[in-house]
Structure formats: C-alpha cells, structure tokens
Swiss-Prot record:
Cytoplasmic polyadenylation element binding protein that binds to and regulates the translation of specific mRNAs. Essential for progression through meiosis. Involved in spermatogenesis. InterPro entries: CEBP_ZZ, CEBP_ZZ_sf, CPEB, Nucleotide-bd_a/b_plait_sf, RBD_domain_sf, RRM_dom. GO terms for molecular function: mRNA 3'-UTR binding; mRNA regulatory element binding translation repressor activity; ribosome binding; translation factor activity, RNA binding. GO terms for biological process: cell differentiation; negative regulation of cytoplasmic translation; spermatogenesis. It comes from Caenorhabditis japonica. Keywords: Developmental protein, Differentiation, Repeat, RNA-binding, Spermatogenesis. Residues 1-38, 534-568, 592-617 are annotated as: Disordered. The lineage of its organism: Eukaryota, Metazoa, Ecdysozoa, Nematoda, Chromadorea. This is Cytoplasmic polyadenylation element-binding protein 1.
Length: 617
C-alpha cells in the first residue's frame, strides 16, 4: 500500500489492481521530463485513453473511501468477483467495493488511482476512448467475427425455407463445432449445409418475406392439381412461370365449384373483373389464396400496397415471410382474366344477409368465412326517370365515396337532405369497370343544387359503412361565360368557375374582375376553380393577376374602376336581361340563354387551353 496526495485528502490505494495492471510507484516530478503539467513521458495519461467519466469516477471513489472508510459486504464469497479480486484482499468479507466497482476499473491499460491530481492533463488533449475487442484469441481485426454477416445468415434461416439434407447430429456438430475462431459461423460454413428449396415447393415463390402480385391458375397435371404461378412484370415468359404443387385439396372450393356448375352463366357481363376479398386471416399464406381462387380461372392476386402499422414493416418482413408492411391489412383484390370466372365465383359462394362468403384456411384458422364482394355493373348508374332530361349545370362532384356504395344508395342519401335527384353516376375504371371512389350527382331543380352546394357535406350510409363526404361543384369543359356569353372574350371558353353559393357561374377574365371586385366587395375572397384534364383545382387567385398587383380583399384603383364601369355598361347594352337577376333564376333560365347565344356564336371558336403551370401565391 502506498500513500498518494490528492486534492480531496490522503487516501490509501492498493498497489495491485483488479486486472493486474501496472501501477505507478513514483510520482512524476515537476522538474523532470514531465513538463510540470502532467504531460511528460512518465505521466500515465499519455500512454492511456482517459475520459472525463474516468476522472470523475476516480474522485468519487476516493471521496467514498475517505468518508466511509471502506464499504464492506458480509459473507461475500472469494470467487464472487473472480480470483484476482479474492487475491487482493486478505479477508473476502471486507471487500472494498468503491476501489473495484467503478467505471475506471474496466479499462485494462491504465491505473487511474495511481495518478496524481495535480498533474491532470487538459481535457482537449485527452484522446477518445477506444474499446478493445471482446473476443480474445484473435490476432488481428480481419480474423474477428463478422456480426453483420452472421445476422444475414440468421435472417436467411428464418426467411427462407431452408432444408438440411444431412440433418444428422454429426452434420450439425460439424457446422457449429469449430477449431479456430476465424471459422465460427462463416458464410462458407453455413452455406455448405444450406440446400436451396425445390422449385416445386410453395415457399420458393415467396421472396424475402414480401407478398408479390402474381398471376395464378390451377390446372391438372398427371391427375394432380398444381398452381401455375407467373410474374406479370417479368421480361420473358420462360423466366416468370413456376409450378407449385398443392399439398391438399380445397374441399370447400371443390364443393362450391360443383354447385356453381348447376347454375347458369349469363352471356352478358354482370360483374366487374375486379373482386374484393375481405376478412382474410392475418397469417394467411399466399399459397392458400392461390389454391382457393385459382380454381375459377386465371386471376391476378393484387395485394394492397399502402404501408401499415406506422413504419413497423421491417419487423413483419422477418416474420417467416408471411407478413410485411403492405400485406397485413386482411384483404386482397383479385383481377380475373375472364368475367365469367367472377360469375362462377359468386355462384360458389354462400349467401348470408345479402353478402357472399367463401371458406379459406390459414395456419391458425381452418375454413374461415371470407367475404367476396363483386361489383355489379347495374349499380353504376341511377336514373330517377329515364325519359327526363338531365341538366349538367346542376351537377355536383362527390369524392371519397366508399367503394361498396351503389348509385341508388347515394341518391337516396342526397334526396333525404337536399331534394330530388335526377341522375347519379359512379366513376369507374374504364378497363375493369370498378369504382374509383367518386361520383357525379345531378339534381332535378336549381333549388336542390344550390342547397347541396351550401350544405357542402352529406352522410353516406351503405351496409356497414357510414362516412361523411364533401360536395363540390362539378366543373365542365368547353363552357362559355355566363355573364357576357362570350361577347367580351371573343367567344373563347370561360377559364374560371366560381364555386361559391352566391355565384355558381363560369366567368371569363373580364367578367371575373367585374363581378368580384367592381360590383361586389364581399366577393373579393372567392377563389376560382379550373378544370385540368380529369381533375378540378381551386386556385388561390386568378392566374391573369400578377402577384405584385393582387391585393387580397381590396378594391381596384380608380383607373380599374373606370375600366370596369365601361365593361359593365357595354355588357348591359348587349345583355340587358342579366341585370338584377338572382342566382336561382340564372340557373333555371340558363338553357334558354345558351340557345339564344348559340345563334350569334361564330362557327370557328378558339378553345381555351392556356392554363399557367406555375402560379405564384
């Protein structure tokens, strides 16, 4: 034991450390090579890696030893902390915990207790701590274990259905029993015992834990049912076709097929080729879906693509390849190549409470009833009276409509709130004829149309769905200005539509400024709606107004007022019937106005198509 002078007082320190470190037997002198600041060659801090945590732990340990005179633990065995700890104490029952249980004791190349407090180095000159390798016996870093490669091998064992051809005790002992550390679970050692799965097994088609969209069809080869699986995005046909043997027969589907053959198949299309399958078990496999629905014909299995579970997809991708971030939602879409296959599928289902169900199994559930929701083509349109005329100027657009909603159901909901409806059309995909989640509704009267625009929302209820959707004006293309009938814009089509309930008209640039800034100050905050392709956009300001000259909720200058007064007087001379007319009367009499203006329209009109791409705010 030796006595060392510290800033906090004298405290005895053992000359033998826990890890057999070499201690400093003599303090470096200020006049020697130490340089007076602990920076000499004899300083213990130059040849070691010391951090602020080590220095603080040293002083805390010294302080506890000075005030507590050592913390003892009764009946502590000699081998509790190893042989070296027992050798350093004559009596193991009086083991000095502060001397050994401190962070500084875990550094194998420095004895901090042997240093002097007046020779502490500057913090900026202390190098960062570099931990040594935990694997003893490696001579260099290249021979150490590659944990990244080990993780890949373990994931391969989980994700892939690897089979061990030599699955004997000797084979496994040769795999894991190694003589040298460098050969511990290396890539060559594991790969030699991993056999690639057969292409005829079902798991070979599944790739790295993700469900892929596949075109499948069940056929009979040598009196055995097999599934022909193909990748629709593959470059060549030979590279995308695989054969998967069925391990068992789907009895529920076979019984349904026998029952469907007894029912007639319509020659006219009755359903969309796209079918929704809901209520799937969470652990259902791709092969079970293929084997269940592939009997009805060639079908594309389209799994949902949106991410689920808030970014936890990586966890599900490692779960034996059955679930991932985009295929755990419990439903799937089927796109059949022939519409008659959909009719056979519906005929094979069981009807319960106006819903169709089919049995499907999973590793944890046997013969679960899943819902088969086919879209009827007769539910696309609804006409209140087929002989009545439909005024498209009284049409509204409704987005976010639930896909199972029929046109008649939507018409019933709107008539309960706003008035009589003459037509409802569900927007569908032109190829598959499947709903896109939007609809167009035409009201029978102008009062109902204005009431629906003012209400803005409607509650759509169908079966188990109950959703609140928004009502917007339906903007059409190739429409003339409702104020000037094209007289002030050289008979060009009107670029803007005002969707506010006080306007609901198409405007040219001149009439927009006159009606929103010159005649009414309370219309200055109205935003124009423009039609671009199949979409309708609401712009923050008219594009013909530059950003520097556009003032929100402000009236034009005196020069602009004089210009608008001239435009107003010229407009009233050409169309005196537009003065002091209400919005309802303008909508009701619009057909007559369009017929009168069509006679004075030149045969050649320039179509409006110049909508600015970049619009400043």
């Amino acid at each position: 034991m030796q006595s060392q002078l510290k800033a906090c007082g004298d405290a005895p320190a053992p000359s033998c450390s826990l890890h057999h470190r070499r201690t400093i037997s003599k303090k470096p002198s200020n006049g020697g090579n130490s340089g007076g600041g602990g920076g000499g060659v004899n300083s213990a801090y130059l040849a070691t890696d010391v951090t602020t945590l080590d220095i603080n732990a040293m002083f805390q340990s010294k302080k506890m030893k000075r005030h507590g005179a050592g913390v003892t633990a009764p009946s502590t065995p000699a081998n509790y902390l190893g042989a070296s700890a027992g050798a350093g104490q004559a009596n193991p029952a009086h083991f000095n915990f502060p001397s050994y249980l401190n962070p500084a004791s875990f550094y194998p190349n420095v004895d901090l207790l042997g240093g002097s407090s007046e020779h502490l180095p500057p913090l900026m000159s202390v190098p960062a701590y570099k931990p040594t390798s935990m694997l003893h016996g490696f001579s260099d870093a290249a021979s150490a274990m590659d944990f990244a490669q080990l993780t890949e091998e373990l994931n391969a064992l989980q994700n892939l259905s690897a089979s061990f051809p030599n699955s004997t005790p000797n084979a496994f002992q040769s795999l894991f029993a190694t003589d040298s550390p460098s050969s511990f679970l290396t890539s060559s050692a594991v790969s030699s015992h991993l056999a690639k799965p057969s292409p005829l097994t079902a798991n070979s088609v599944r790739g790295a834990g993700g469900r892929k969209n596949r075109m499948v069809e069940v056929k009979m080869i040598n009196e055995r049912p097999v599934v022909i699986v193909s990748d629709p995005q593959a470059a060549s046909a030979s590279a995308r076709s695989q054969i998967v043997h069925l391990n068992r027969n789907v009895l529920g589907v076979l019984k349904g097929l026998e029952a469907s053959k007894k029912r007639s198949i319509s020659a006219e299309p009755l359903y969309s080729r796209k079918v929704f399958i809901g209520g799937l078990p969470i652990d259902v496999t791709e092969e079970e879906v293929w084997a269940t629905f592939g009997w009805f014909g060639k079908v594309l299995v389209d799994w949902p693509r949106r991410p689920e579970h808030g970014g936890r997809g990586d966890f599900y991708e490692m779960d034996m390849g059955r679930r991932n971030s985009r295929s755990v939602s419990g439903y799937v879409f089927l796109v059949f190549q022939d519409e008659k296959a959909v009719q056979e599928l519906v005929n094979a289902c069981e009807l319960y409470e106006n819903k169709y169900y089919l049995q499907l199994s999973s590793p944890t559930m046997a013969d679960k009833a899943v819902q088969v929701r086919a879209w009827r083509l007769s539910d696309i349109d609804y006409f209140c009276d087929e002989n009545a005329s439909v005024d498209h100027r009284r049409t509204v657009f409704i987005g976010g409509v639930p896909r199972p909603t029929r046109a008649s159901d939507l018409a019933y909901c709107l008539q309960q709130h706003y008035g009589k409806v003459s037509y409802v059309g569900i927007d569908i995909d032109p190829e598959l004829k499947y709903p896109k989640g939007a609809a167009r509704v035409t009201f029978a009267t102008a009062q109902s149309f204005v009431r629906a625009i003012s209400g803005r929302f409607v509650q759509v209820t169908h079966a188990d769905t109950n959703k609140r959707v928004e009502i917007k004006p339906y903007v059409m293309e190739d429409q003339h200005c409702d104020e000037c009938q094209g007289k002030l814009c050289k008979h060009n089509y009107a670029p803007y539509f005002c969707g506010d309930s006080s306007c609901l008209q198409y405007y040219c640039e001149a009439c927009w400024d006159r009606m929103h800034y010159a005649m009414c100050d309370n219309r200055a905050d109205h935003r124009p709606m423009v039609r671009t392709g199949d979409q309708t956009r609401i712009l923050p300001r008219p594009p013909h107004h530059s950003t520097s000259h556009y003032h929100h909720r402000s009236t034009p200058s005196h020069h602009h007022n004089h210009t608008h007064q001239n435009v107003t007087s010229s407009l009233l001379e050409h169309a005196p019937h537009l003065q002091n007319t209400s919005i309802i009367s303008r909508i009701v009499n619009r057909n007559n106005q369009n017929n009168n203006s069509a006679n004075s329209t030149p045969p050649q009109m320039k179509q409006f198509s110049a909508i600015p791409t970049a619009i400043g705010y």
